[in-house]
Amino acid sequence: MTQAPDREKALELAMAQIEKSYGKGSVMRLGDEMRQPISVIPTGSIALDVALGIGGLPRGRVVEIYGPESSGKTTVALHAVANAQAAGGVAAFIDAEHALDPEYAKKLGVDTDSLLVSQPDTGEQALEIADMLIRSGALDILVIDSVAALVPRAELEGEMGDSHVGLQARLMSQALRKMTGALNNSGTTAIFINQLREKIGVMFGSPETTTGGKALKFYASVRMDVRRIETLKDGTNAVGNRTRVKIVKNKVSPPFKQAEFDILYGRGISREGSLIDMGVDQGFIRKSGSWFTYEGEQLGQGKENARTFLMENDEVANEIEKKIKEKLGIGAVVTDDLSDDGVLPAPVDF
């Protein structure tokens, strides 16, 4: 057996040769490099940021958002885009469904003038454009809406009744193999919005599955299941939806946490509604009957009135948000620049 000093010398020579061939940093001891906190992009809902465990969507990773129709998938993605832009980032939207509403996006806070938008003809074109944008290194967030609309060229050029089994799954698998390393190097967050389908003949367990094969399930660091659970009403008028998001996969924090928040029609995720819910849960806002009180000051009777008060008094809303984040230890790092607020815990890879 080779003596320990000889083995160490052989290892050093091998590492030197690898670095000479592939560049400095191509191989290293994990202990030699200080672990960097995971930079995040806030989602727009403090409840969802808490459920994700790190204060938002991780940068440099693949994120999948899926759920039934009109459940709020695109709204969640657009809020992340707005937050990335607010921090000075560059955002791109691959609109494969050709259904992006610029006016709605603007109401959610998206800077539509600077948003890069592509409406590709084929799935290959969409993913090639996405890959080129990611490799530019200039992008902070990329949204692909949706995986189901990424139609392979062969299917588009074929006849209506032709069978094209597995084409889309192979396309997604190849694209994700190429993209994953580039995403990590550039720090770009790629959000894939996906639709649900039902498997035929399933007797036990959920028959629901997502489109595009299994590759996205493996490559995604975060998978979020978005569901509409209740219609919000003001009197008899429907004004929005109560939405539940379950984190079904999370490689950067413990998974299977849930978050609930309000999505208001024409306005998106209600930041104030999330602050009221989390404020009550964490003991900063007192609820007595239907009245909400913060530090002796009445916010209003009923959630709608309390929501209106916080919308009109932004400094109170910011104060509540700051206290919640400080107590739960989230939101310290939201860009690539390290702050003095503290270091996030090391990621847990499940």
Swiss-Prot record:
Keyword Metal-binding: no
Domain of life: Bacteria
PROSITE patterns, A to Z: RECA_1, RECA_2, RECA_3
GO terms classed as biological process: DNA recombination; DNA repair; SOS response
Keyword line: ATP-binding, Cytoplasm, DNA damage, DNA recombination, DNA repair, DNA-binding, Nucleotide-binding, SOS response
Compartments reported by the entry: Cytoplasm
UniProt-listed Pfam families: RecA, RecA_C
Record PANTHER family: MITOCHONDRIAL DNA REPAIR PROTEIN RECA HOMOLOG-RELATED (PTHR45900:SF1), RECA (PTHR45900)
HAMAP family per UniProt: RecA
Entry protein name: Protein RecA
Organism ancestry: Bacteria, Bacillati, Actinomycetota, Actinomycetes, Mycobacteriales
Gene transcribed to yield this protein: recA
